[in-house]
Amino acid sequence: MKIGIIGAMEEEVTLLRDKIENRQTCTMGGVEIYTGQLNGTEVALLKSGIGKVAAAMGATLLIDHFKPDVIINTGSAGGLAPTLKVGDIVVSDEARYHDADVTAFGYEYGQLPGCPAGFKADDKLIAAAEACIAEHNLNAVRGLIVSGDAFINGSVSLAKIRHNFPQAIAVEMEATAIAHVCHNFKVPFVVVRAISDVADQQSHISFDEFLAVAAKQSSLMVETLVQKLAHG
C-alpha cells in the first residue's frame, strides 16, 4: 500500500517528513513531495501550499505521479463544534466549500455545477482514524469540514458559515479542494486535522500561538493511521 499525505504548511509536514526513511524530494509546479517509508510503509508526503488552488494542484500531481492508494489530509483547522478546544482532533465524514455560491441557478450553497454538494470521506478510513483516536484517548469530533480561501477571523464571516453550514465542525482552507480531486480520480480520502484555534475574532492570535500544538497532534494521528492502514 502507498499512502498519500497532504499538508499545506511547513509546520504541518515537518514532523512527518523528518521520520521518512530513504527520503527523496521531488519539486514540481511549486510544490514539494517527499517519498520514502514511514515506519516501513510507502508514503508520498506533499507540502501543497495554502489555499484551494494550491491544494488541488498538489493533490493532482501527487495522484498522477505517485499513484497513492489513499490520501490523508493533515494539518490544522479552526474549531466550530462547541466541544472542540486546541489540540483536539477533527475527522471528516464530508467536505464542502463554504465560499462557493451558484444558488442563483438552483444549486445548494457551496455546490459547484457538475459536482456533488459535498464530498464524502471513505468509511474505512474514517473508522481507522477513529480507532487511532481511541488508542490515544484523544478528544475528537467527526463531521462536516468546510473550506474556503479565507482565514476566518471575524464575527461576520463566522456567522455566515454557521448560517449556511450549522452542522460544520471545523473550517480551513484546503480540505474540500483535495476531496474534490480525490472524488474525480476515485481515490479514497479522509481529513484528519487538529484544532489550532476557535474561529472567532481572536483566532489569528490563537493560530500563531498553537499551530505547533496542532501540528504535533495531527502528525501523531497520521503516523498512527498509516501504521493501522498498512498493518491492520
Swiss-Prot record:
Cellular component aspect of the GO annotation: cytosol
Molecular functions (GO terms): adenosylhomocysteine nucleosidase activity; methylthioadenosine nucleosidase activity
Keywords tagged on the record: Amino-acid biosynthesis, Hydrolase, Methionine biosynthesis
EC main group: hydrolase
Active-site residues, as the UniProt record annotates them: E12, D197
Family label: Belongs to the PNP/UDP phosphorylase family. MtnN subfamily.
Primary gene name: mtnN
Pfam families: PNP_UDP_1
Keyword Cytoplasm among UniProt keywords: no
Superkingdom to which the source organism belongs: Bacteria
Disulfide linkage: none
Hydrolase in keyword set: yes
Assembly and oligomerization: Homodimer.
Catalytic reactions of this protein: S-adenosyl-L-homocysteine + H2O = S-(5-deoxy-D-ribos-5-yl)-L-homocysteine + adenine; S-methyl-5'-thioadenosine + H2O = 5-(methylsulfanyl)-D-ribose + adenine; 5'-deoxyadenosine + H2O = 5-deoxy-D-ribose + adenine
Gene Ontology BP annotations: L-methionine salvage from methylthioadenosine; L-methionine salvage from S-adenosylmethionine; purine deoxyribonucleoside catabolic process
Residues binding substrate, per UniProt: G78, I152, M173, E174
Annotated pathway: Amino-acid biosynthesis; L-methionine biosynthesis via salvage pathway; S-methyl-5-thio-alpha-D-ribose 1-phosphate from S-methyl-5'-thioadenosine (hydrolase route): step 1/2
Function summary: Catalyzes the irreversible cleavage of the glycosidic bond in both 5'-methylthioadenosine (MTA) and S-adenosylhomocysteine (SAH/AdoHcy) to adenine and the corresponding thioribose, 5'-methylthioribose and S-ribosylhomocysteine, respectively. Also cleaves 5'-deoxyadenosine, a toxic by-product of radical S-adenosylmethionine (SAM) enzymes, into 5-deoxyribose and adenine. Thus, is required for in vivo function of the radical SAM enzymes biotin synthase and lipoic acid synthase, that are inhibited by 5'-deoxyadenosine accumulation.
EC number of the protein: 3.2.2.9
The protein's name: 5'-methylthioadenosine/S-adenosylhomocysteine nucleosidase
